[in-house]
Each structure stands twice: as C-alpha cells, then as structure tokens.
Regions:
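C-terminal regulatory/interaction module of P-loop NTP-utilizing enzymes
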Residues: 1-310
Length: 310
C-alpha cells in the first residue's frame, strides 16, 4: 500500500490538490483495504486526469459518500476522470456501459446452473457493492426504466439491493458510483429528476492547451515540445470547429490523436498517421475537407518522424 500511495500522493501534489483532501484520502486508504480477489482491478490508468478544480470537487464529494454524474461533450475527459478517481481512491473499478437493451439482470446478475444447482451469476453492480468498488456507469442516459429502477436504491441513503429469491445486499461503505453522459446524442434520453437528485453533478469543461499537452506528455515524454504543441493546437482547432457546428465531433478524437502520434514511432509519416487517427474518422466528404484544411495549418506535409522524436 505504501508504494501505491506514494505514487498517488505525488500525482495529487503535482496537481496542487489541497493538503486537507490529500490527508482525508490517505485516511480512506487506511480505513478500507482491498480484498485479494479484486486487487487486479485496482490499476493506474494509462492517462491521468489534469485539472485541479474538477479533481478537488470530485474528491470532496466522493469522500463524503456522494455519487457523481459527469456531464459534458465528447473529448472532455469524463472516462479519464472516472479511471483516475478509482485509482487515487485505491478501489477496484467496475465498468458498466449502458445501452438500450441493458436491463436489471445485466446489472445485478441472473440465475445460472453451476454443478447442477441454480445459483446467482453476480453482475457488475452486485460485485461492486460487495467489494467496495467504484462503479463507472457509462452513458447512463441511455438506460431504460428497468435498469434505472435498480439504481435508485443503491444511489440514495438506503445503499442496498433487494434481489428476489436471494438476500438483501448492503453496499460496502467504500462503494461509490460515477455516471457519465453525453447530453443530446442519438439514443440518449432525459434523466428523470429522481435519478439526478441522487448525484452530485459536474459539468465537464472543454479541454484547454495545458490539459491536452498534459495528456500528450504522459504518453510521449521523449517527444519534441514544439511537435507536441502543434498536435495540441490541432486538437483545439478542431474543438473550436465542432463547437461552432462547422464539423461533427467524429474527428475530435483525443484517443485517435494519441494513436496517430504513436504510429509515427514506427516510421509512418505524421500526415499519414493523422489521416488514420483524425481525418478518416469523418465519412462526409465536405467535412473531411474542412478537417484536412485544419490539419494542413498545424502539421506540415514535409514532417517526418525526426520532427517529432528528434
């Protein structure tokens, strides 16, 4: 635990998180040990979240036993924040992706045959409640009523699950749930007031240059500063275009940008890598031309891997 906490503490101090919050987090770690069978679910994410204000708001709410709802546009770091919070709290992470066909059995579990006996095959919500995990409720506004009804009792003061034919499950005191939602996307629905009232809500701001550079430097500490700044500028230019409705958010893809930069390590030219990671994410001819124009202002076609890696 000591080595694990030392790394977390350094990250929090680098983000200039208040010492009072760091102290409470340390107490949380000491109070709630992780059981051996789920220790592999506690891992440091590839990308850590950048942003003091959002981190402090999230940590404070979770320390007080509240659940979080992260709302915001694409590429604002919602899932990165979820993974980072699970890591800094030292809790096993359970990812639950909602879609129109998700029902209560997918969340809690369903009956199955084991050694000629009917037993409950535990779902992610059940396991999260049992082991004190952090449940990531991804795209929660795509959930239908059957799935939402399960969430009501676990998200409010009752903190329990009633399973017909089985015992009542009380949530482990370290259990927390973090929902994410992209508002207004196809297939999504309005969250009802009763469900929203069970969350503390954070509206995720759009990424700025510092936060994009933070992500790129985590992945590519050996990259040329000027090149990484150019890639960050490309992302921000596309973000502005998407905000004003000139393009869709398909090409506004931070994962695609990171993958494109990675591909240049294997000798692929930066412009070809960006073609795969960013430009080709749009399938509309006219939109693709706009994205290509934006790329040409930031990434010269003459660039090679040496311009990025020296």
């Amino acid at each position: 635990m000591r080595n694990h906490w030392t790394e977390i503490e350094k990250y929090l101090e680098d983000q200039k998180i208040a010492q009072e919050l760091i102290g409470e987090l340390r107490d949380f770690h000491m109070r709630y040990e992780v059981e051996d069978q789920v220790k592999e679910r506690v891992e440091k994410p590839d990308i850590l979240f950048y942003g003091k204000k959002i981190l402090e708001m999230s940590i404070a709410a979770l320390l007080q036993g509240d659940n979080l709802l992260l709302s915001g546009a694409k590429a604002t770091g919602k899932n990165v924040l979820c993974e980072t919070l699970a890591w800094i709290f030292g809790r096993p992470e359970y990812d639950i992706s909602f879609h129109v066909n998700t029902d209560s059995a997918d969340l809690i579990g369903t009956d199955t045959f084991i050694n000629n006996e009917v037993r409950l095959r535990k779902g992610p919500i059940y396991q999260c409640a049992e082991f004190g995990g952090f449940g990531i409720l991804d795209e929660i506004n795509m959930a239908k009523n059957d799935a939402v009804s399960v969430l009501h009792a676990i998200l409010d003061h009752r903190r329990r699950i009633d399973i017909p034919g089985y015992n009542r499950i009380l949530l482990h005191p370290a259990t927390r749930f973090i929902g994410t939602m992209n508002y207004g996307y196809a297939g999504t629905r309005e969250l009802n007031e009763a469900l929203v009232s069970r969350f503390m809500v954070i509206d995720m701001p759009e990424m700025d240059e510092d936060s994009v550079l933070f992500v790129l430097r985590q992945h590519f500490p050996d990259g040329e500063k000027s090149a990484l700044k150019a890639f960050a500028g490309l992302f921000l230019d596309l973000q502005i275009k998407a905000y004003h409705g000139e393009i869709s958010t398909k090409s506004l893809d931070l994962r695609g940008l990171v993958s494109a930069v990675k591909a240049t390590k294997s000798g692929l030219s930066p412009i070809d890598a960006i073609q795969m990671g960013i430009i080709n994410k749009s399938f509309d001819v006219f939109e693709k031309e706009i994205v290509e124009d934006v790329v040409s202002t930031r990434i010269p076609s003459s660039w090679t891997g040496k311009d990025i890696w020296g």
